[in-house]
């Protein structure tokens, strides 16, 4: 445990961030690869309806991520702050209650999703060509595998919060690699032709089950020397701690939920322009995840460090960690913008051979890539406020980003410029959000500095 404390308290900022962030980045990249692998393998069929169906289901899958954020981010941020404040027993109670609440919520979500499967698909814009494919994917990925996926992500966040970033990264990475291996086996060898979407979905489900099993084994192995545990025998956490879980977790979940709603609207609007446009848009939104997943990995490594030092009242180290994470994320995002704009046609061709989809996808990617640095800055700021327990600010920034800017701008640009307007929406909306975010950041920082001086 002393070694873990040195990472939080003593190591040079870049070294601490590297130790915490690199495993998270690797796991995020492998997660990205297996998500892209689904699209790539399905794209080998040259069937835009299959590709479009997977894109349609993505918002529901993201809803499950919002559940994992609710308890993984909310509980994880609080655990790191409790450890920084030397309250180990309370941190242990928070860990246990976070696990049980996430399990109950995940089971309820999977059941509701299956119960209202058809209305949900209609809401997402499914048509006669995509509905059956989307239903197959939804059943296995969310209906059966969703609980295991949520629990894996929650456990990953929680064990990272106590310094076990490497173990968290290995678990998520292992699941991703397994998914990539299972995809072609199930899609092209086990399941018959025409059921490639089902094969991809079953591969994802199985990898989620095995990943969850890994995390259970890890928790059993390290629980004696940490605050990790699922037993409620020591009692429930204080009422203030439960409120704190939700005060950070709800904004973290709502942030994903609002992004999900905006994505549903974008998909539905894009579907009006045809399956080819939707398939091209789906490929682009997968490809843009490379810099964003790296950025998310940086932020995941940043959160425990900032939360711990915030509670320990080491504001200078906290500020250095935040600045270091921001510089790294923006640099990577800018490099990806250059790469995507230069090789857009080759990138889209890698996923699908349909000429019309390639043409649209190339134009979409060249436009959409410019939003990447601004997207990173948006969620980097939200992660920062989650880390210091300022959930209300995170919530309102999420509302500003999606409700005030993204959705209205999307509707306006779609009405005026069609599919291309939808693609440019993210850049305009997130540039506006970044300006608002930094005004809020400097206001909060100045206010806290003034309070400290008094």
Give the residues covered by each predicted segment.
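N-terminal transmembrane alpha-helices
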Residues: 8-40, 44-45, 59-74, 78, ...
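Short runs within selected transmembrane alpha-helices of multi-pass transporters and secretion channels
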Residues: 72, 141-160, 168-179, 200-216, ...
